[in-house]
């Protein structure tokens, strides 16, 4: 036998987040969670296989309340009530079918719903034998049609009433199969039968309760909650009730699967995707291998806000891991305003492993595209996903990963198929630079029109009228006689009235004169940067200044003449002056010359024009960070101005900004080449995968590229281990320690100073790199700073680098390169042009600290029968040094002269090649040497950094050498030389131990050869001196 249980709906429940749980013997199942409603509609079917109908077997339907505690799990908070139906009562019905009946939910014995009316639930049950295996589906269809079309009168009563009336008091109904086939012919019989049932139940009730059985009430209840309606009619109904008051739902937590713009209106795209029997859905099902696709009709849920809903079922094709499974989609319109649509889809797959523990959620959002397009109306489709777990499981991570991968592959096919029908719009197509510029410049204002608007004021009109009036008066009057203190050529006022009139006329004419001069100056100041094309190749910044709104002057009563100054990478561009305009309309295009590296910040400031030599009062300013805006956002940006009066007036500027690279990959290579000269170290271009991960981690635009990354500790109250990232425009840090994430970045331009602090006990013997930001800069990274000084400067401490010296030098060099002024950069380029440096060392020379010296190994020591000054001639750069080095196997030996960097400290550089006796690979060598007096003037200490080129793994390490040449005897005629050596690894390799051993042996032998040659050459020179 098979038991079919249909849980249709409930009403008047005391909670809004509910679901029904079904128990039949040892079998259990449950419905989906109905959200935000106390009258849920489930319309779900459950089938159980039972061996026999016993007296003690009951069907128990429990209604439970669920509460969502976080984004991933849902925990039940209490039992609302139960309904218990004996199977024997169902078997005693005609055709063993209990038609849809309202049951009163029994109150629980404990919990928070004990003394509350728990509502009612509409159920239908049917028992089918093996010979009627296909009748279950027919019964379900019968019940749904009865609910929607005919219905039954509400049967109000507890299950106990049903038990007491099961002997000889059964309700008589027509067979559902005949109702489905002949529903129209049997309407009268059905109503007649219902009246007989109602009368008989009223007369024969053994417990004295009045039990009604008219299914029309049930029909009314169901119809008020779910009404069959057409798709377009339902959308019109939702649109009429939407009234733009419902907000568009946020994207689901799992992430965005599709975010694409299409050249089609939102309404047409919505119909194309969700209309019944959509051809697109059929083609997609065929492409994805779906079968037995059954789309239910769109029905209207009559809640506080009417919502269209339907159920779609299909079979997913079998894969290598999972067999063919049935999936059920519940699609609900969350918003339909005519221009914006949101469809929420809940997908249940109970047949997959752990399928009863989770449901996949999808959210389709269709939005109108506000940007101008060349092809007409456009829309944006965003599809996000999430997963809801009804119970916890240890396979949660694996389920999420599998769902993410499967959805990604499915919606790639979805996007590709949709793109065959509607043209997709790239961001560059949506807002094409040339098109926008052409639009901005299409309606330029003439000077005549600007002059008319400027001079059309009361003061100018009064001055003109009064001047005309005086001139006409003069033409009609005879010349006055000379009297008083007048003389020929001087006519004075003869009364106070004449004096007053003359004064007014003079003041008005003065005002007109000042306005005229101001207008001429503004015209001369106009557009000196407007329309000037950018020069060179590199990063081109183009700004279309559209308009300003609600600009406020320092003096509220005065009119002002605004103009805008743009500053980027030390260069400025100025717009034209708009005379006496609170809402100026510029429509101007300004371009900056090509830049070698992408700019970080654009400073915008609005001034009140006050003559050609004065800057004027500021009306507001703003800073646009290119790293915090996408290309789409920059293409249509409304900038809020900052300032006392600007913020109070909500002043804004509308800009369209385009940043593009005119030189392609060569721009990046040129930038790296310039940085390498400053850093003194080879910088490799990172892989696209690393660059993409870096951009995604910090939300950076695609043009930002990674230069270096280092593992280190960020020092705060407790050190935090993470990675320090260096890119062309930012310094970034990221850490994830047991799920606690620390992430921030700041601009190179925000750095005020970088200091290297000596090791301390608190830093575990590691030097500290201190980065201090400028005042009130980098406030977004404040949570990563260790302290903030009295001036408002943030301090960041980094420690425990693998190679502290190389890291600190690289960071210092990048900072200096980025913060150099434009003129200084040009000067450096001119000086370095066409100059090759054979002594270029991958790292700059540095003093080996005492702490580093303690870690160096002594590889050679010798006593020399000569004083310290003679020994130091080995490094003197003279003929003796050249002979020794050539005989020891150095070819093309060249050295610079010793230069004093600071008192007592001298530096020089060397360049040579090894012959094949010294190294089978040959290879070049560059060295940097630094010498300084030893303590107490006992001799000299010379530090040397050696870089090997054109040898295997030569770029993975550097050799640090320290020579200590000191006095050995009391008479100062003998000396002692000790040589220490250390290998500093820049990159980790498996052959470190082998290479270190080889270098130690080679250099030990080399030092012996050099000092033996020195003793021979010194003895020979002494003999020649004696002769």
Swiss-Prot record:
This protein's record includes keyword Cytoplasm: no
Annotated segments matching region Disordered: 158-177, 201-223
Span of domain VASt: 253-426, 855-1018
Keywords: Membrane, Repeat, Transmembrane, Transmembrane helix
Bilayer-crossing regions: 452-472
Compositional bias of kind Basic and acidic residues: 158-167
CDD domains the UniProt entry points to: C2
PANTHER family in the record: BNAA05G37250D PROTEIN, C2 DOMAIN-CONTAINING PROTEIN
Disulfide bonds: none
Species this protein is from: Arabidopsis thaliana (Mouse-ear cress)
Stored InterPro entries: At1g03370/At5g50170-like, C2_dom, C2_domain_sf, GRAM, PH-like_dom_sf, VASt
One Gene Ontology cellular component annotation held by this UniProt entry: membrane
GRAM domain sequence ranges: 693-756
Main location, first listed in the record: membrane
Keyword Coiled coil: no
Record membrane topology: Single-pass membrane protein
Subcellular localization: Membrane
Ranges of Polar residues composition bias in the record: 206-223
Residues annotated as domain C2: 1-103, 516-639
Biased composition range(s): Basic residues: 168-177
Name by which UniProt lists this protein: C2 and GRAM domain-containing protein At5g50170
């Amino acid at each position: 036998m098979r038991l079919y249980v249909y849980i249709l709906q409930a009403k008047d429940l005391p909670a809004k987040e509910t679901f029904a749980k079904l128990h039949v013997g040892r079998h259990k199942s449950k419905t989906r969670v109905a959200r935000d409603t106390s009258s849920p509609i489930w319309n779900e079917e459950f089938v159980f296989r039972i061996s026999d109908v016993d007296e003690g077997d009951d069907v128990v339907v429990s209604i439970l309340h669920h509460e969502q505690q976080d984004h991933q799990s849902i925990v039940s908070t209490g039992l609302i009530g139960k309904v218990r139906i004996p199977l024997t009562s169902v078997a005693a019905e005609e055709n063993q079918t209990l038609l849809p009946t309202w049951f009163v939910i029994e109150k629980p014995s404990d919990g928070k719903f004990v003394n509350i009316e728990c509502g009612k639930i509409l159920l239908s049950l049917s028992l089918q034998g093996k010979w009627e295996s296909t009748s279950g589906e027919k019964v379900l269809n019968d019940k749904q049609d009865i609910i929607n079309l005919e219905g039954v009168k509400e049967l109000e009563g507890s299950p106990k009433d049903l038990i007491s009336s099961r002997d000889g008091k059964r309700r008589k109904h027509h067979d559902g199969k005949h109702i489905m086939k002949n529903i129209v012919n049997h309407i009268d019989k059905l109503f007649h039968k219902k009246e007989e049932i109602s009368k008989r139940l009223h007369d024969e009730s053994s417990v004295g309760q009045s039990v009604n059985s008219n299914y029309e009430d049930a029909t009314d209840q169901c119809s008020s909650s779910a009404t069959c309606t057409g798709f377009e009619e339902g959308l019109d109904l939702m649109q009429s009730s939407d009234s733009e008051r419902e907000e568009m739902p946020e994207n689901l937590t799992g992430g965005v699967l599709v975010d694409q713009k299409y050249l089609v209106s939102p309404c047409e795209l919505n119909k194309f995707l969700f209309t019944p029997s959509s051809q697109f859905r059929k083609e997609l099902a065929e492409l994805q291998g779906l079968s037995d696709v059954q789309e239910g009709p769109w029905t209207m849920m009559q809640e506080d806000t009417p919502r269209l809903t339907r159920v779609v079922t299909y079979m997913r094709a079998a894969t290598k891991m999972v067999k063919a499974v049935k999936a059920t989609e519940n699609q609900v319109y969350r918003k339909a305003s005519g221009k914006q649509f949101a469809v929420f889809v809940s997908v249940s797959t109970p047949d997959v492993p752990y399928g009863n523990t989770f449901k996949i959620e999808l959210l389709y959002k269709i939005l109108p595209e506000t940007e101008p397009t060349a092809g007409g109306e456009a829309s944006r489709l965003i599809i996000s996903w999430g997963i809801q777990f009804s119970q916890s499981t240890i396979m949660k991570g694996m389920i999420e990963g599998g769902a993410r991968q499967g959805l990604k592959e499915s919606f790639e096919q979805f996007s590709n198929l949709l793109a065959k029908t509607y043209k997709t719009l790239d961001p560059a197509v949506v807002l094409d630079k040339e098109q926008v510029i052409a639009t901005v410049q299409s309606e330029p204002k003439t000077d005549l029109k600007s002059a008319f608007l400027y001079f059309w004021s009361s003061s100018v009109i009064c001055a003109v009228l009064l001047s005309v009036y005086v001139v006409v008066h003069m033409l009609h009057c005879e010349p006055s006689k000379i009297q008083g203190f007048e003389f020929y050529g001087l006519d004075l006022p003869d009364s106070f009235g004449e004096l007053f009139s003359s004064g007014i006329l003079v003041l008005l004419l003065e005002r007109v004169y000042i306005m005229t001069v101001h207008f001429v100056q503004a015209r001369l100041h106009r557009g000196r940067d407007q329309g000037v094309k950018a020069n060179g190749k590199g990063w081109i910044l183009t700004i279309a200044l559209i308009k300003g709104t609600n600009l406020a002057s320092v003096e509220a009563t005065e009119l002002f003449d605004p103009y805008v100054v743009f500053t980027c990478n030390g260069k400025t561009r100025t717009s034209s002056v708009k005379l006496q305009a609170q809402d100026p309309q510029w429509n101007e295009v300004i371009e900056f010359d090509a830049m070698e590296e992408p700019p970080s910040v654009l400073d915008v400031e609005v001034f009140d024009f006050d003559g050609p030599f004065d800057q004027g009062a500021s009306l507001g300013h703003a800073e646009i960070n290119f790293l915090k805006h996408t290309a789409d956002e920059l293409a249509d940006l409304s900038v809020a101005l900052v300032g006392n009066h600007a913020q109070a007036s909500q002043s804004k500027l509308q800009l369209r900004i385009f940043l593009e690279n005119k030189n392609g990959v060569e721009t990046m290579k040129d930038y790296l080449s310039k940085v390498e000269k400053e850093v003194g170290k080879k910088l490799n271009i990172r892989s696209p995968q690393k660059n993409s991960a870096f951009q995604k981690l910090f939300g950076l635009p695609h043009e930002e590229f990674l230069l270096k990354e280092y593992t280190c500790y960020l020092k705060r109250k407790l050190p935090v281990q993470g990675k320090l990232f260096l890119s062309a425009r930012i310094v970034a840090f990221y850490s994830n320690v047991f799920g606690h994430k620390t992430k921030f970045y700041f601009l190179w331009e925000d750095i005020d100073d970088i200091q290297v602090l000596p090791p301390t006990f608190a830093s575990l013997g590691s030097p500290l790199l201190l980065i201090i930001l400028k005042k009130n800069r980098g406030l977004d990274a404040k949570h990563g700073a260790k302290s903030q000084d009295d001036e408002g400067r943030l301090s960041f401490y980094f420690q425990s680098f693998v190679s502290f010296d190389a890291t600190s030098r690289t960071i210092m060099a990048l900072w200096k390169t980025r913060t150099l002024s434009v003129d200084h950069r040009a000067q450096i380029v001119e000086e370095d042009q066409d100059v090759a440096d054979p002594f270029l060392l991958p790292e700059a020379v540095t003093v080996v600290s005492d702490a580093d010296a303690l870690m160096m190994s002594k590889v050679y020591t010798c006593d020399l029968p000569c004083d310290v000054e003679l020994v130091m001639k080995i490094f003197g750069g003279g003929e003796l040094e050249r002979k020794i080095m050539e005989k020891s196997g150095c070819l093309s030996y060249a050295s610079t002269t010793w230069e004093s960097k600071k008192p007592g400290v001298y530096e020089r550089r060397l360049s040579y090649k090894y012959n094949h006796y010294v190294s089978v690979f040959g290879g070049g060598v560059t060295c940097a040497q630094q010498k300084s007096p030893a303590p107490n003037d006992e001799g000299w200490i010379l530090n040397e950094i050696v870089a090997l080129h054109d040898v295997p793994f030569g770029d993975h390490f550097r050799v640090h050498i320290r020579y200590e040449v000191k006095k050995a005897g009391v008479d100062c005629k003998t000396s002692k030389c000790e040589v220490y050596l250390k290998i500093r690894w820049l990159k980790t390799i498996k052959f470190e131990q082998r290479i270190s051993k080889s270098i130690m042996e080679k250099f030990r032998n080399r030092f012996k050869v050099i000092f033996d040659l020195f003793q021979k050459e010194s003895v020979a020179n002494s003999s020649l001196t004696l002769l």
